[in-house]
Amino acid sequence: MHDEKVDRTTDGNGYIYDLTYAELCKLDCSYPDKFAGKFGRLQIPTLREYLEWMAEEEDLITNIELKNSVYYYGGMEEKVIDMICEYGLEDRIILSSFNNASIVLCRQNDETIAGGFLVEKYVDNAGVYARTCDVQYYHPNLEYLKEEHVRSCSQNELNVERLIVT
C-alpha cells in the first residue's frame, strides 16, 4: 500500500492499521477512481507474495519502501529483513523510508541489504548526512534535487534516485 489510508488507491476507506488482512484482501487496489477498471480488479499482494514473485525474476532489483513515517510499527524492520533473507534477495533489495531512523536500524540489523533515505525537503550536505548514516541511496523530491546534492552524494559514493510521488 502506498498511503496510510486505503481511500485513494482502493475502493475501501479507513486506515490500514484498522483493517484485518481478510478485509484488505477484499479491496480492489486498482486505483478505481483513477483508472476506472482499466486493469480489472486487483488484490493487494502481501510482501511474501511479492518476494516469491521477485525470487523468480532473476534480473530484477527493487526498492521496498517501509511505510512507517506517519505511524511507526514496532518490529517491522526485523520482520521485513527476515523475509528478504528467507528468499535470498539481500543483494536485490533497497529498503527506503521517510523515517530515516528506521533505515539506520535496518542497516544495523543487516548490512548486506542496501538502504535509502526518502527526502521531501532540502537537506544540507545530503551526501555527508546519508553516508554518516551508512545508506547507499538518496531519494530526494525532484523539487529539492539540486546540483549540490548530486555532487555531495557523488563525493560520498551514494546513488541518487529522485523520489516519485504517485
Segments (PLM) and residue ranges:
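Metal-dependent phosphodiesterase/phospholipase catalytic core, i.e.
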Residues: 2-120, 133-136, 140, 147, ...
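Thr-Gly-centered strand-to-loop micro-motif
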Residues: 140-141, 162-163
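Short acidic, glycine/proline-enriched helix-loop-strand junctions
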Residues: 149-162
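Catalytic cores of alpha/beta
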Residues: 166
